[in-house]
Amino acid sequence: MREIQVVFGIDVETDIGSWTPFYEGVTKATPILLDLFAKKSIPVTSFWVADTARRFPEIVREMDSAGHETGTHSLYHETVGDSLFEIPGTFPLLPEEVLPRIKTASNILEDIVGHKVVSWRCPRLFGGTHVTNALEALGYECDATYPMYFYNEQ
């Protein structure tokens, strides 16, 4: 039987993206997921919204120390890249805001885990040139914003 390669990443943020102040998924589901990942030997990348990580640094450290990669998912789950469609009540960052916001988010996560964070995923999967340029300038190695089929590789 052929082995199947799977990349597994989870976004860690408020319960409904940018629209609620609740963290039940973080506080209640994370321990369940960590147990499942450990039982099945599944490594994951957890893409943390930095504001969420700041609220739950012990959970970030627990995941990281369990061998899971810590990635960045923005500062406040804002639209960092180019909007693909309008979302009421949200506005994309200005191009000149992108690099400082990603840098601030990166610094928060790196302070929590104690090492460089090199993976990124845009909220809402809205990427763009300004994001790519900022990630390159900050030394990121992976942008998980675009699914693999985007690159015609499966």
Briefly describe each language-model feature range.
Residues 1-119, 124-154:
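Catalytic alpha-helical scaffold of carbohydrate-active enzymes acting on polysaccharides/glycoconjugates
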